[in-house]
């Protein structure tokens, strides 16, 4: 165990985590020259297209140190976006150390602070690294001062490197060897292994990534999942280099994958403990806290005959993405679907894109909403994640909305525009700290304002230099209402939204105007209303198509024409009473996508 080092690579988005991973693999011979390519650990098409890491990837490599010791390094490349912070915390739970990568041109950013504090809270050894020192705009001295002032880390032994050119990577490997502690555990104790990640393979069943804390794992060992008490035989064991390599044993302190022929997607939950059977361990390992979704949205298939495939796809995806929550939901307009919980808008977009690409589904998503806390007159609490249900609740004492604690780091010259944006989003300033040319803003902003497009607008007003980190803070009394959309006096539940009183009129006008432009005309008037309770806020009418019943009358008495017009009037009146309004799926798609 003295020759094992387990560590994660953490950083803000685009600071060079994946490129440093490439250099470590290249120098240690994890892949041949023919197999090497840039961002080798970003295996998903979405990761390559967006240039971000979405899923943590584990790699085992061997490094021969300058003192001729062979060191086994198990490292995990983690995502940098705030929406995937749960992936980071899960990865850190399997490690004794963390490499904190900081871009020498951009300096400390909000997610750098958050990731570093997460690692320090878990008592990990954090090694700060300045990357991209080869660029002409790099300013190592300024960034060192930011690290000391903003994060509070010593920079006496900071590593200067360039992942692109390979400068400083050997020095980094030596620092990992000497500074990150080796894992603690007893190979003679009963087996305890933590499930870090799981995914479903069509041929092999559930594949689990595990960290062996005590004991060891061998092929054909009988194991027990401690939460379900179910017993399985280990069929295959291996590691990633990053390509899968089969092994006969996973020793104490090692990270690797196991296949046990589990066909049930809930058979090996992430965060669970694996032990042997018999001679089981008495205690479960402290896993990681189950994260709560920050936003909810309804997901529906455009083709109703795909529902069973959709249900299976969500199950397999949730195994690989433990932060995804879902439960069945029915909409009068969109049919059967699922109410899904996400960590943010990017997380929602990635899940939707993966469902469409990996499972060939056509998905429509309703407007995302946060979770509101409803206090009833009898002081009972009700948590609401579906907007249209608000109008059905009676005896409400007050409605509370979630507030996010936001840390915004930006250059001082963009302060004015950023303060204005935070004010427009109903933000309250808690603190402001100055660090040379950088400012750290501490704001409390309603979560509903943050999760939608706040980050995009923040980047816009700061020319891309501002960075954001946010977390749930508390629930606060809010003056919000449920805005319902009625078409010919029938409520369209999938278009209901919860809106703050100051924004109700604008929101109502926007939705009604879009619907008027998108819904096709019928042979009778269509009335579109935006209402709060029974009060109509905005109303418009899509005028009926006029069928010319007089086209065949070329003369004769005027009473003949009057008779035809009267008959048409009676028919239209009857049609309005019993006629169904056809709202194409494309209309919902355009309205909801715009929202």
Curated annotation (Swiss-Prot):
<dbReference type="GO" id="GO:0045727">
    <property type="term" value="P:positive regulation of translation"/>
</dbReference>
<feature type="binding site">
    <location>
        <begin position="14"/>
        <end position="19"/>
    </location>
    <ligand>
        <name>GTP</name>
    </ligand>
</feature>
<dbReference type="InterPro" id="IPR027417">
    <property type="entry name" value="P-loop_NTPase"/>
</dbReference>
<dbReference type="Pfam" id="PF00009">
    <property type="entry name" value="GTP_EFTU"/>
</dbReference>
<dbReference type="GO" id="GO:0005525">
    <property type="term" value="F:GTP binding"/>
</dbReference>
<dbReference type="GO" id="GO:0097216">
    <property type="term" value="F:guanosine tetraphosphate binding"/>
</dbReference>
<dbReference type="Pfam" id="PF03144">
    <property type="entry name" value="GTP_EFTU_D2"/>
</dbReference>
<dbReference type="InterPro" id="IPR000795">
    <property type="entry name" value="T_Tr_GTP-bd_dom"/>
</dbReference>
<dbReference type="Pfam" id="PF06421">
    <property type="entry name" value="LepA_C"/>
</dbReference>
<comment type="function">
    <text>Required for accurate and efficient protein synthesis under certain stress conditions. May act as a fidelity factor of the translation reaction, by catalyzing a one-codon backward translocation of tRNAs on improperly translocated ribosomes. Back-translocation proceeds from a post-translocation (POST) complex to a pre-translocation (PRE) complex, thus giving elongation factor G a second chance to translocate the tRNAs correctly. Binds to ribosomes in a GTP-dependent manner.</text>
</comment>
<dbReference type="InterPro" id="IPR035647">
    <property type="entry name" value="EFG_III/V"/>
</dbReference>
<dbReference type="InterPro" id="IPR005225">
    <property type="entry name" value="Small_GTP-bd"/>
</dbReference>
<dbReference type="InterPro" id="IPR004161">
    <property type="entry name" value="EFTu-like_2"/>
</dbReference>
<keyword id="KW-1003">Cell membrane</keyword>
<dbReference type="InterPro" id="IPR038363">
    <property type="entry name" value="LepA_C_sf"/>
</dbReference>
<dbReference type="InterPro" id="IPR000640">
    <property type="entry name" value="EFG_V-like"/>
</dbReference>
<keyword id="KW-0472">Membrane</keyword>
<keyword id="KW-0648">Protein biosynthesis</keyword>
<feature type="domain" description="tr-type G">
    <location>
        <begin position="2"/>
        <end position="184"/>
    </location>
</feature>
<keyword id="KW-0547">Nucleotide-binding</keyword>
<protein>
    <recommendedName>
        <fullName>Elongation factor 4</fullName>
        <ecNumber>3.6.5.n1</ecNumber>
    </recommendedName>
</protein>
<dbReference type="InterPro" id="IPR035654">
    <property type="entry name" value="LepA_IV"/>
</dbReference>
<dbReference type="GO" id="GO:0043022">
    <property type="term" value="F:ribosome binding"/>
</dbReference>
<dbReference type="GO" id="GO:0005886">
    <property type="term" value="C:plasma membrane"/>
</dbReference>
<keyword id="KW-0378">Hydrolase</keyword>
<dbReference type="InterPro" id="IPR013842">
    <property type="entry name" value="LepA_CTD"/>
</dbReference>
<dbReference type="InterPro" id="IPR006297">
    <property type="entry name" value="EF-4"/>
</dbReference>
<dbReference type="GO" id="GO:0003924">
    <property type="term" value="F:GTPase activity"/>
</dbReference>
<keyword id="KW-0342">GTP-binding</keyword>
<dbReference type="GO" id="GO:0003746">
    <property type="term" value="F:translation elongation factor activity"/>
</dbReference>
<comment type="similarity">
    <text>Belongs to the TRAFAC class translation factor GTPase superfamily. Classic translation factor GTPase family. LepA subfamily.</text>
</comment>
<feature type="binding site">
    <location>
        <begin position="131"/>
        <end position="134"/>
    </location>
    <ligand>
        <name>GTP</name>
    </ligand>
</feature>
<dbReference type="InterPro" id="IPR031157">
    <property type="entry name" value="G_TR_CS"/>
</dbReference>
<dbReference type="Pfam" id="PF00679">
    <property type="entry name" value="EFG_C"/>
</dbReference>
């Amino acid at each position: 165990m003295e020759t094992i080092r387990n560590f994660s690579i953490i950083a803000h988005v685009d600071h060079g985590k994946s490129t440093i991973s490439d250099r470590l693999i290249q120098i240690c011979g994890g892949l041949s020259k023919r197999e090497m390519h840039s961002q080798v650990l970003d295996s998903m098409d979405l990761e390559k297209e967006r240039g971000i890491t979405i899923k943590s990837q584990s790699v085992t490599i061997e490094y021969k140190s300058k003192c001729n010791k062979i060191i086994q390094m198990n490292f995990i490349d983690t995502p940098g976006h705030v929406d995937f912070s749960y992936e980071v915390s899960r990865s850190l739970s399997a490690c004794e150390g963390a490499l904190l990568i900081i871009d020498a041109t951009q300096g400390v950013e909000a997610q750098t602070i958050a990731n570093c504090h997460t690692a320090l809270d878990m008592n990990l050894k954090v090694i700060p690294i300045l990357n991209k020192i080869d660029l002409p705009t790099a300013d190592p001295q300024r960034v060192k001062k930011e690290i000391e002032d903003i994060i509070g880390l010593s920079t006496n032994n900071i590593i200067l490197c360039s992942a692109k050119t390979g400068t400083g990577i050997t020095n980094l490997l030596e620092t990992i060897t000497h500074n990150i502690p080796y894992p603690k555990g007893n190979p003679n104790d009963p087996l305890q292994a933590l499930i870090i990640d799981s995914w479903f393979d069509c041929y092999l069943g559930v594949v689990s990534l595990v960290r062996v804390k005590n004991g060891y794992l061998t092929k054909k060992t009988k194991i027990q999942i401690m939460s379900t008490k179910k017993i399985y035989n280990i069929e295959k064991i291996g590691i990633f280099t990053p390509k899968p390599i089969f092994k006969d044993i996973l020793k104490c302190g090692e990270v690797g994958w196991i296949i046990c022929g589990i066909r049930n997607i809930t058979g090996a939950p992430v965060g669970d403990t694996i032990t042997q059977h018999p001679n089981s361990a008495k205690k479960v390992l402290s896993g990681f806290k189950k994260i709560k979704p920050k936003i909810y949205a309804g997901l529906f298939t455009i083709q109703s005959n795909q529902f069973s495939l959709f249900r299976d796809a969500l199950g397999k995806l949730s195994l690989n993405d433990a932060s995804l929550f879902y439960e069945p939901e029915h909409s009068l307009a969109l049919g059967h679907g699922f109410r899904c919980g996400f960590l943010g808008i990017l997380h929602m977009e990635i899940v939707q894109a993966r469902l469409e690409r990996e499972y060939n589904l056509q998905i429509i998503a309703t407007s995302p909403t946060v979770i509101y806390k409803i206090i009833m007159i009898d002081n009972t609490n009700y948590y609401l994640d579906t907007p249209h249900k608000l109008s059905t609740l009676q005896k409400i004492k007050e409605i509370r909305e979630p507030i996010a604690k936001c840390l915004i780091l930006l250059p001082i010259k963009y302060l004015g525009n950023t303060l204005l944006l935070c004010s427009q989003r109903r933000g309250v300033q808690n603190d402001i700290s100055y660090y040379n040319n950088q400012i750290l803003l501490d704001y409390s902003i309603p979560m509903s304002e943050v999760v939608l497009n706040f980050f995009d607008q923040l980047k816009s007003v700061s020319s891309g230099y501002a960075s954001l980190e946010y977390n749930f803070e508390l629930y606060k009394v809010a003056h919000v209402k449920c805005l319902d959309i009625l078409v010919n006096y029938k409520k369209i539940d999938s278009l209901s939204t919860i809106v703050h009183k100051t924004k109700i009129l604008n929101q109502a006008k926007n939705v009604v105007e879009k619907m008027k432009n998108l819904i096709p005309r019928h042979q009778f008037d269509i009335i579109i209303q935006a209402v709060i309770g029974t009060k109509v806020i905005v109303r418009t009418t899509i005028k009926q198509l006029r069928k010319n019943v007089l086209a065949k009358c070329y003369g004769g008495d005027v009473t003949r024409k009057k008779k035809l017009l009267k008959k048409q009037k009676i028919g239209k009146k009857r049609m309005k009473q019993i006629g169904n309004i056809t709202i194409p799926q494309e209309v919902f798609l355009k309205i909801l996508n715009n929202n």
